[in-house]
Amino acid sequence: FIAYAIMSVPAGLMIDRFGEKPVLFLGFLMPFIGTTLFACLHTYPMLLASSFIIGLGMAMLQTVLNPLQRVVGGEENYAFVAEVAQFVFGIASFLSPLVYTYLIHELNPDIYTEGRNFFIDLLAGITPPDLPWVSLYWVFTLLLLVMLVAVGLSRFPKIGLLKASSIKSSNKFSPK
């Protein structure tokens, strides 16, 4: 959670300076780097470092996505779009323990049989047998890669923020 405190304001400044798409891309890139690092180097210090990197990216995503929800459906549909986003997050929080349980079960050295499932075979090849839970980091890495490609290929219109949404709107930070 310290990463949120550290990155939220700088992410807002980056949005003001560079726009939404680069910050959104970077917001997915940082967790991609964090999950890849831990999936490859599964030590406790790397877990701490990768969790912090993932947190920085998630703070960036929250900072850029919340205002984009207002743009997606228009001001009049903002509440609906925000609720749909929360619904999707709720589905993910419901499904993730099921995916985790499935991966732990299928990658158990006593149960795993090569050749039954291509995806499980792939994960078995890159996940240590004694740490099957690391496979979830590989799944997250794959999902983040898909999001990076999607954001990279997407076209973003120029989005004007509401005056109150911009850091520049506050006189507290402006030199006198």
Please give the residue ranges for each predicted region.
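Central cavity-lining transmembrane alpha-helices of secondary-active solute carriers
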Residues: 1-13
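Helix-breaking motifs and short loop linkers at transmembrane-helix boundaries and internal kinks
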Residues: 19, 40-45
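Primarily marks hydrophobic transmembrane alpha-helices of the MFS/SLC 12-helix fold
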Residues: 21-24, 47
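MFS-fold secondary transporters
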Residues: 34-38, 54
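C-terminal membrane-cytosol helix-exit motif in multi-pass small-molecule transporters
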Residues: 100-109, 118, 122, 128, ...
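Glycine-rich segments within core transmembrane alpha-helices of 12-TM secondary carriers
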Residues: 77-111
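Intracellular juxtamembrane helix-capping segments at the cytosolic ends
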Residues: 60-74
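Hydrophobic core of transmembrane alpha-helices in multi-pass small-molecule transporters
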Residues: 46-61
